[in-house]
Amino acid sequence: MARALLIVLDSVGIGGAPDADRYGDAGSDTVGHIAEACAAGRGDRPGLRAGPLRLPNLAALGLGLACEGATGRVPPGLAPGEPLRALWGHAVETAAGKDTPSGHWEIAGVPVRAPWGHFPDTHPAFPAELTAALIARAGLPGILGDRHASGTAIIDALGAEHVRTGRPICYTSADSVFQIAAHEEAFGLEQLYETCRIARAVCDPYRVGRVIARPFLGSEVDGFRRTSRRKDFSVAPPDGTLLDGLEAAGRAIVSVGKIGDIFAHRATGREIKPAGNAACLDAALDAFAELPEGGFVFLNLVDFDTEHGHRRDVPGYAAELEAFDARIPEIHAVLRPGDLCVITADHGNDPTWTGTEHTREQVPVLAFGPGLATGAIGRRETFADIGASVAAHLGLPPLGAGRAWW
């Protein structure tokens, strides 16, 4: 019986979606603009990387051709060699968003139909009733922030005051999110998590997709830095996902990275949450090597987004892509005849773009495995085609959305 490995390269978009102008993102292109910047010498950083973007293994899977399908051009350095080793195409999101839950849920067969709630870019950003309820239920002396902000910038600005006052830093963004940053030692990690659990309940009437705990350490003198103990408190998908179908069929499921958080820990099987892309990929490959027939490993690699996309860090993003590319041979090595690996993304986060937010983009779809077909699968009109294709490959009943490319 076949097995499947689904890898989401968080924010690795390949060109503005057809409706990107509605989001102020027309012309955005995460992979394409990184490749162009590197070709022009703007992706160099001493001690990290230099020169053109080098992704030979992803190019051999059809990434450059997927980019061409999305934008009409192959990014510099991504022209494929022969023979190509995968099915390649690009997918368009049907959900009205450019956030992590919307992208992942649609990949898993459940497009978000009702719009998420968002907070205005004002100060204060949160309704007074919401803030009052959180303060009362969590026993807080108050909150700091209460506005749209970059997570690293607001910690730098308010970290010292937070440590002095005990008030957590609450902020949001263009996504449907309520984020709480607090010092792991001065405030306490468990208290931060409990505050987020309370915030999750307080935010439910506002249709907020995620409450995120953003722990940090450091001091006013030495500076503050985020830690790896972030935790997301998401609402559950409204309908049955690919994961639910796998669970109902009694299949082995392993969720690596923040997958468990994204799906509210429903039907996520064994959860593994290491820190960093390299450790997450290690864990996924180890789990897949031991996976029984019919099993499924679902992996999110978040560092592209959090460490480089939001920070508009072209050299860092390029280096992260190259590091992943170098490990593609390890992925091939764990695949047995009949196994399937799909590499895709959930949205864009163009590090050359204005601001610090996600970008509304199309995503690559690269599907491969020993003995599987190769060639173009064209434009997929919903991310749900990915989940539908994985379900078909694993012999599951059809999902509620999406059309398999098999």
Curated annotation (Swiss-Prot):
CDD domains the UniProt entry points to: PPM
Swiss-Prot/TrEMBL cofactor(s): Mn(2+)
Keyword Transferase: no
Domain of life: Bacteria
Annotated cofactor note: Binds 2 manganese ions.
Keyword Methyltransferase part of the UniProt annotation: no
Record EC number: 5.4.2.7
Any Pfam family: Metalloenzyme
Pathway participation: Carbohydrate degradation; 2-deoxy-D-ribose 1-phosphate degradation; D-glyceraldehyde 3-phosphate and acetaldehyde from 2-deoxy-alpha-D-ribose 1-phosphate: step 1/2
Disulfide bridge map: none
Family: Belongs to the phosphopentomutase family.
UniProt name for this protein: Phosphopentomutase
Species of provenance: Methylorubrum populi (strain ATCC BAA-705 / NCIMB 13946 / BJ001) (Methylobacterium populi)
